[in-house]
Amino acid sequence: MIKAFSSEVDPGSREESASKKQPAAAEITEDGFLGGQLRLRQPKSGHRAGHDAILLAAATPARSGDRVVDLGSGVGAAGLAVARRVRGIDLVLVEIDPDLAELARNNAAANAIKAEVVILDVEAGAAAFDDAGLAPDSADVVLMNPPFNDPSRHRASPDGVRQRAHVATATTLAAWVHVARRILRSNGQLALIWRADGIAEVLAALDRGFGSLEILPVHGDATAPAIRILVRAVKGGRAPTRLHAALLLNEESGVPNKWVQEVLAGKGELPLARR
């Protein structure tokens, strides 16, 4: 059994947390997100947070008082971005890599965001989740950015952390969705991001136990196929699936989409976040 380690970060302990030893991994950079509202320390190489995490956060339908679980949180970018947008959530960051989990803990403290950090393999069994305080029917919202690159078309990185964070196996998505279904309460909300050409995999994984799907395709520009899909699903939902108008990261002229830039700067949310 994989042992889970859980620790809670309280905003009042930010100075003490910041003084703790950082992971002895590669060089660390400090980067601004949400227009500088969120400062995150992360490895200079390997798996780094970017637009995917912030778009996922902007699509997460959380409300104040919700228990929100970020599966595979990395350094905490998506979950902490949700907490910055929606005050008063009970945030849990779940990450398998101890170094990234330590960065997530310090990032939460440095940004004065209260969060529980759990070191746990998302594909661990139910008993490991119970031990970590993530029992069945205990979460209101789950968000996740699982590894989604197709191994048959993507050369795996020699960096083990990067490979684990980016390359999916044949069972990755189904396993992560199964965990979300188990820990969510009835009518709980799931938000996820996946590569657009894998939409059939997403629909298949959500077919058992989820409904009321809302799908938002993300395009680099209007002339190219979608590169990502953002999906919101409801545990036990029965409403018909809705396909939203495409989100264009850049206009046809190549200029960044102004509304998307506002969302990335923390000045707005995506339609999937409204409930």
Describe the predicted segments one by one:
Residues 65-74:
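Conserved class I S-adenosyl-L-methionine
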Residues 104-105:
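Conserved SAM-binding loop
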